[in-house]
């Protein structure tokens, strides 16, 4: 006669615990798989929202998907040449490509002003169309190390390739109330209208203590967050240097955004 299962015995309790754990694991795994498409859709919408925001096209009533489709054209740029990549996949992500040795480059330490060690060979750029269909501004991704985190943001510039229309940071882990203020629209507003380059084409934008007195190129550093501010400066120095967007911006100036 088969021995009756005793759930109150040590072995019985262990079997029950393992069975419950297995069932819970299956449920959690199923939930993760089931929710992933929803999470990915939300991440995409959040990113599009930040792009629209830095372009000045976002308010509480904005239909993000519709406005993005109508006003934003995503292109992929070869950073080495500044040319558009014609056969790039629609879902190309420089952030993902940057983790693939075949799609990225190692940055020489002396050139790594942003402290990122490597970057993708290609990156997305976003052309913002006006009501007349003409390109009115270009949104460029930018990232670099702060005090505690990699700071990911967007910079909106005019078609002259020099004048800043806006900046935003959409992901960062700097100290709340200090370095975390890079996400404060009041500080971001200080960049609007600033020129990236001087008359000789050299990067002139600078972020530092008292830099705001330079009305054309300077932005005051965040109070109590010198290392985060230095990271912002380093990000601009790298991405708007010869190893970043300079080849692309030079082509914009000579041929136009189209």
UniProtKB/Swiss-Prot annotation:
It is an enzyme of class 7 (translocase). Composed of six subunits; NqrA, NqrB, NqrC, NqrD, NqrE and NqrF. The keyword Transport applies. Its cofactor is FMN. Signal peptide: none annotated. This is Na(+)-translocating NADH-quinone reductase subunit C. It catalyses: a ubiquinone + n Na(+)(in) + NADH + H(+) = a ubiquinol + n Na(+)(out) + NAD(+). The gene is nqrC. The modification FMN phosphoryl serine is found at residue 226. NQR complex catalyzes the reduction of ubiquinone-1 to ubiquinol by two successive reactions, coupled with the transport of Na(+) ions from the cytoplasm to the periplasm. NqrA to NqrE are probably involved in the second step, the conversion of ubisemiquinone to ubiquinol. It comes from Neisseria meningitidis serogroup A / serotype 4A (strain DSM 15465 / Z2491).
């Amino acid at each position: 006669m088969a021995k009756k299962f005793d759930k109150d015995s040590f072995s019985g309790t262990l079997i029950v615990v393992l069975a419950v754990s297995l069932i819970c694991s299956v449920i959690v795994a199923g939930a993760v798989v089931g929710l992933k498409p929803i999470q990915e859709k939300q991440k995409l919408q959040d990113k599009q929202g930040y792009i629209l925001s830095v372009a000045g096209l976002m308010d509480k009533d904005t239909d993000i998907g519709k406005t993005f489709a109508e006003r934003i054209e995503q292109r992929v740029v070869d950073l080495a040449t500044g040319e558009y990549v014609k056969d790039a996949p629609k879902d190309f992500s420089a952030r993902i490509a940057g983790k693939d040795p075949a799609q990225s480059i190692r940055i020489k330490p002396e050139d790594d002003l942003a402290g990122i060690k490597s970057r993708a060979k290609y990156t997305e750029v976003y052309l913002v169309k006006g009501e007349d269909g003409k390109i009115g501004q270009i949104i460029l991704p930018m990232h670099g190390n702060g005090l505690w985190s990699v700071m990911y943001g967007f910079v909106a510039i005019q078609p002259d390739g020099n004048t800043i229309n806006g900046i935003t940071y959409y992901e960062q882990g700097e100290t709340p109330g200090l370095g975390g203020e890079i996400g404060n629209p009041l500080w971001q507003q200080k960049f609007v209208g600033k020129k990236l380059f001087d008359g000789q084409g050299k990067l002139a934008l600078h972020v530092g203590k008292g830099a705001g007195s330079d009305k054309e190129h300077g932005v005051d550093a965040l109070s109590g967050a010198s290392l985060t501010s230095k990271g912002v400066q380093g990000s601009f120095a790298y991405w708007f240097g010869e190893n970043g967007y300079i080849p692309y911006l030079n082509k914009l100036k000579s041929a136009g955004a189209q």
